[in-house]
């Protein structure tokens, strides 16, 4: 699984938040404005990060006049799932790693896992 650097993650968080809010794909200017309060980044830096993320396969882009519009290829949850599966692949014993993971989560998270497993066994999508 490809990882994200700190700045790449920050940019992805802006795009994932826009996606969560139902907002269309973003230009580099949109991302620069969203980051203006938190980070003092040059617009060219944001453009470079967006281009790099597109080349790595994290973003899709389409022309909009002279600008590019970017959108995440995968949801935040999908990305985290890939990271978790990648980490699981690195273990020598997946079963033990899964048991250890389940022991380390909260009781509310255990309930979520139970519901997801029940939905899988009954072929119903989880709520």
Residue ranges, per PLM feature:
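Short alpha-helical segments that sit at the start of domains
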Residues: 1-14, 18, 75
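Short, hydrophobic-biased segments on the C-terminal half of alpha helices
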Residues: 47-51
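Short beta-strand "wing" residues that participate in macromolecule-binding interfaces
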Residues: 61
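Short acidic, hydrophobic short linear motifs in intrinsically disordered regions
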Residues: 21-35
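Short, cationic-aromatic polyanion-contact patches
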Residues: 7, 64-83
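Glycine-centered, phosphate/nucleic-acid-interacting loop/turn motifs that mediate DNA/RNA or nucleotide
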Residues: 57
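Amphipathic alpha-helical dimerization/coiled-coil segments
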Residues: 82-123
């Amino acid at each position: 699984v490809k990882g994200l650097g700190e700045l790449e993650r920050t940019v992805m968080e802006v795009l994932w938040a826009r996606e969560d809010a139902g907002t269309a794909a973003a230009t580099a200017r949109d991302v620069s404005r969203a980051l203006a309060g938190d980070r003092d980044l040059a617009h060219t830096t944001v453009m470079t990060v967006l281009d790099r993320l597109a080349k790595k396969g994290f973003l899709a882009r389409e022309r909009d006049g002279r600008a590019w519009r970017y959108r995440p290829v995968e949801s935040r949850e999908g990305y985290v799932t890939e990271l978790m599966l990648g980490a699981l692949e690195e273990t020598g014993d997946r079963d033990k790693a899964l048991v250890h993971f389940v022991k380390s989560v909260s009781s509310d998270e255990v309930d979520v896992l139970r519901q997801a497993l029940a939905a899988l066994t009954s072929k119903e999508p989880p709520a």
